[in-house]
Amino acid sequence: MSRETIRYVYILASHSRVLYTGITRDLRRRMYQHKHGLIPGFTAEYAVNQLVYFESATHIRAAIERERQIKGWRREKKLRLIESVNAGWIDLSEGWFEPKGRPGPSLRSG
């Protein structure tokens, strides 16, 4: 019996809202790769590196099918999916790669 691993189906956007749908086993690592241009091709060329949506699946076949389903949708349906959970289109990976030990804002006045 094989051990199941969680897979993530995710949607990235550029500042101009170009969309990319992908699948990964390690969302944090994949986002690092996208944000640092380490994956050549579409996402690097169009700066598609803001995580605007993701969901998890416990079976690889379910994740692959879901990715395929989303990729087959018209843009409007993808936008509705994103906005159903992230109306502000914030980058859900914001702050994941901040340097550790970075000083926060000063609490002193004056």
Predicted region positions:
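GIY-YIG nuclease catalytic motif and its immediate N-terminal context
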Residues: 1-40, 44-57, 61-68, 85-109
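Short arginine-rich
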Residues: 68-81
